[in-house]
UniProtKB/Swiss-Prot annotation:
Family: Belongs to the UPF0337 (CsbD) family.
Domain of life, source organism: Bacteria
Organismal lineage: Bacteria, Pseudomonadati, Pseudomonadota, Betaproteobacteria, Nitrosomonadales
Protein name: UPF0337 protein NE0131
Length: 51
């Protein structure tokens, strides 16, 4: 069992990092499949919501 004791600053940094990684994934989808950035973001969100 892991117990994490994150302060607000660390939590915010982690949240920002995750958001950045999702944006990078959307960018890679856009680049690979040649679709609009908004559509790529929708697909990433749909995938994330399915988890």
């Amino acid at each position: 069992m892991f117990i994490f004791n994150l302060n607000k600053k660390e939590s915010k940094m982690n949240e920002d990092r995750i958001k950045g990684q999702w944006k990078q994934l959307a960018g890679k989808i856009k680049e690979r499949y040649g679709i609009a950035h908004d559509e790529a973001r929708k697909q990433v969100k749909k995938f994330h919501d399915s988890l």
